[in-house]
Structures are given as C-alpha cells and as structure tokens.
Design a protein with these regions (language model features):
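Conserved active-site helix of classical SDR/Rossmann-fold NAD(P)-dependent CH-OH oxidoreductases
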Residues: 42-49, 82-87, 119-120, 146
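C-terminal substrate-binding subdomain of Rossmann-fold SDR/epimerase-dehydratase oxidoreductases
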Residues: 91-210
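Alpha-helical segments that scaffold the active site and NAD(P)H-binding pocket
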Residues: 49-54, 86-90, 127
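Short aromatic-enriched loop/helix-cap "lid" or pocket-rim segments at secondary-structure transitions
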Residues: 15-18, 72-77, 148-149, 174-175
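N-terminal Rossmann-like NAD(P)+-binding domain of SDR-like oxidoreductases, especially those catalyzing
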Residues: 1-73, 199-202, 210
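Glycine-rich "substrate-gating" loop/helix at the edge of Rossmann-like oxidoreductase active sites
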Residues: 34-37, 65-80, 104-116, 139-141
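Glycine-rich, phosphate-binding/catalytic loops in enzymes
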Residues: 19-23, 78-80, 119, 153
Length: 210
C-alpha cells in the first residue's frame, strides 16, 4: 500500500542547524505559535512509521516548505505570509496608500515552493520505494520577509513604505530545507519564484479578490 502524508517545515525545531535535515525532527523545542499544528502532524508521521514497521506498507511523509500558488487563501486573518503580502500590497496600491504593515521586524527568512512542484513531488514519490519515510520538499531558495515585500512591489510596479509591527511575533528565524534526499531519487523543483508569482498573481486578479 502506498500513501503520501504531508508534514511541514514548521514542525521542525524552532532553532535548528541550516539547512534543515529530516533527522532534525524532534531534536529541539517547537515554535510556540504553531505548536498544536506541529504536534498533530508529528502524530501522523509516527503513525506512518509504525504502519511501515508493522505492516510493511510504503507510507512516506513529504515535508514541504511554505507553499503558494493559484487558489490560495488570501484571508488576512488566516492566510500564510506570502498570499497575505500579495493582498496587502495589491490593495495598498489600488487604494493609493503609502505603506503596508508586516508582523515583526521582517528579518525572518522563508523558503517558498510553488504548488505545482509539491503536486509533482507527491506523484513522483507515491509509488517509489524509498528507505526514508521523511523527505523534504523545497526550492532551496529563501528570502527575508521584508525582501519578499520588495519583490512583490517590484512585480506590481509600486513603492510603499513598510511599517513593522513589533507587537506581533517574528516566528521561526529560518526554515530552509535540505532536499538532498529528494534530489537523490531524481526529484527537482521546476518553478522559479518569478514564474510562480506570475501564475499566482494572475489567478489573484482573475478571482477579483477583495
């Protein structure tokens, strides 16, 4: 039996050596802001490991970094940072505002992977026999939150001041994944940040997100 369970880069220890290897799971304290989510995901991973041991199944746990792309969630109360930035900057430009606000100091670094790359990884590894249960899936490319702001502004052809809300958390400082295991089986990501953003923003405009 084959199964893909999706973990996440945010269930690794809050402070970890970079890039993050699969073996670092459960070697340090979790990020408090998403601890319940992390515990639930880790429980699923342990179930997969136990099934493989007891029933000789072929269950794998892919560990993606931040995923973005068409049909993303742009609700500012519940969305991840990248779609939130897209919406904030788009709306600020449209309403001729002079600034946007971000959480924390903007120095936390994040790695992004386009949604089609994750879908490709799921299909690639579903029936493939691997000795590893955990397999990181990422692009190998990270930027500071504040630099993602500048990238989006450049793509939208606008310039806005960035107001940092120090009352809000920064989150985990870095979450860059080591994807050597995935690459050893022949998987590679295909979408650059620029290409992925173009598809994502086109979808955002098509859906007329308010």
């Amino acid at each position: 039996k084959n199964l893909i369970f999706l973990g996440s880069s945010c269930i690794y220890p809050r402070i970890s050596r970079m890039p993050i290897k699969e073996k670092y799971l459960l070697t340090g304290e979790l990020e408090k802001t998403n601890e319940p989510y992390a515990i639930a995901k880790i429980a699923g991973i342990k179930m997969c490991e136990s099934y493989n041991f007891q029933y000789k199944t072929n269950f794998k746990c892919l560990m993606p970094c931040n995923i973005y792309g068409p049909n993303d969630n742009y609700d500012l109360e519940t969305s991840h940072f990248f779609p939130a930035l897209i919406k904030k900057i788009h709306n600020a430009k449209k309403k001729k505002k002079k600034f946007i606000e971000i959480w924390g100091n903007g120095k936390a670094k994040r790695e992004l992977t386009y949604v089609d790359d994750l879908a490709d990884a799921c299909e690639f590894f579903l029936s493939k026999k691997t000795k590893e249960v955990l397999i990181n899936i990422g692009s190998g490319y990270e930027l500071k939150i504040i630099d993602y702001c500048k990238f989006i502004m450049k793509k939208m052809k606008c310039s806005l001041a960035i107001k940092k809300n120090s009352k809000m958390p920064n989150g985990t400082p870095r979450k860059l994944l080591d994807c050597k295991i995935a690459k050893s089986y022949g998987w590679r990501h295909r979408y650059t940040l620029e290409k992925g953003f173009n598809f994502t923003y086109r979808d955002f405009l098509r859906r007329n997100i308010k």
